[in-house]
């Protein structure tokens, strides 16, 4: 529901509140016969600011300087210190980490085959820089969901937006899945799960197999969302091996890294190409010998040799794929882009691949539909751009409230809604209850 201006609760200690939020909290305390704790002393307050904002304690010199400023004007000293800490690079590192937890940031794929993501760091740095640049939250969301589809003014903008979509490329993956269709559906499911929990505070993925048991999210809505992500190609960059069948390429980024260690001379390129050709020839001969041995009923002793040669071939190919035709190191990253033609999704009964039901159009969650929600998505693109615009619309209050609640949790140890990624019926109601319809849980300009 859209927040609305509500009348503030009456309180007895009218001089204590400094904001609307204080009025709600004080009213709840007074209802229980309690009074607020006294204000913190200068040293305690300074330590809280440092730990909360940059994750480091103040030095003795900083304690002393703050004490001098505090004695002159406590309010001015406090506000100046907040501004100073927000401007430090450690602020982005501290608070970017909180978002990275929500975005399930890790540098490997997890699950049965734990392959590394050597380029995940670009997304990590993007998040840190976004916090340090005080990027508006709606822009932050749009870039991560559909950065590759946003308008740009420079190659640098294009690169940043591509890296932002690493939000969708990270996460656990069943890289040993034999069925490519099943892998695509599982990948889309994981992307739906992280997007809806991180941004909307809703658990949508259980609607893959049945209508949501607690929230008004039918299976048709789940597959409408799934179609958007099935129409999206994900680049996460793991290699293909015998135990990892679903590796992909990485995105070629427009701004080259100035890293001489990643470049190759023409002589080195020729050497690697020659070694690659030799390894591919040996691998082909070994595989042919293994097939002939099996056909003749003999023992096949070549499996370990074949695996070693495959790893060698993969390594040489990766080395060549990391440079352009001139040997200059490419700038690579994780992220997503649209497939040429979108997928029109089909509902799968109980989520089972061999039990297709009706086709549904790509779309959004109807329970959150608002004025301006698109009736039909474009036939020539995935619909992620429209999804990003829908998520960040001024008519959609949920993303801002979810983010405000996450900030509250990190500052006070517990969110106003304690189930920070579940604002649904199975989550916890806001406390105090008056916050449910209040506009106090919004992000200001």
Where are these predicted regions, by residue range?
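Short, structured secondary-structure elements
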Residues: 1-252, 337-357, 361-366, 399-437
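Amphipathic alpha-helix face/heptad-repeat signature
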Residues: 191, 195-198, 275, 309-312
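Short, charge/polar-rich alpha-helical segments
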Residues: 251-280
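Heptad-repeat amphipathic alpha-helical coiled-coil interaction surface used
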Residues: 269, 273-276, 280-283, 290, ...
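Charged, low-complexity interaction regions
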Residues: 288-302
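Long amphipathic alpha-helical scaffold segments
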Residues: 301-344
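Structured secondary-structure scaffolds
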Residues: 374, 378-379, 386-399, 403, ...
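N-terminal low-complexity segments that are often proline-rich with Ser/Thr-Pro
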Residues: 438-445
